[in-house]
Amino acid sequence: YFNLNGDPSKEGFDQVMYINADKFTPADSLYIPTGEIKDVEGTPMDFRTPTEIGKKVDYSFDQIKNATGYDHNWCLNTYKDGKGDDKAVCASLYSPKSGILLEVFTNEPGIQVYTGNFQGTGIACKHGIKYPKHVSVCFESQKYPDSPTKIAQGVKGWTDATLKPGKKYYSH
């Protein structure tokens, strides 16, 4: 979880996020992926240009409304033909306040981005600070969520997370 502003008492929606992805996997009201792969174009899911997170949040958009922020998987453009380019930036987070830039690299096909939608419980944390909702951003590189179910259902375009006997798994 990252709050590059250095102030955990304030939400992190003023951080600038970039995600190198033309598509994302929508989730239902229980946060289970629907099996669709949708374009980000023209939606609040489009972070192909670095943008302040708060400028994209639109609670009338069903995906944002259901999750009360971002908790979604993006289908990375850095993953093609079953291979990920771990030398290319797949996502980044920047704080104009601190000047800190975080760059994310992975060989995985997807990245789950979570904006602390269930933080802000009022529980005192480090130094007695009560973290607000949306205080931080988390990047989780991964296969697409609910992969075993979607593969079993024959969903096209879904990445398989099955580790077969004798095979090695390596993720970075």
Role assignments for model-derived ranges:
Residues 1-172:
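An exposed, glycine/acidic-rich loop-and-rim segment of catalytic or binding clefts
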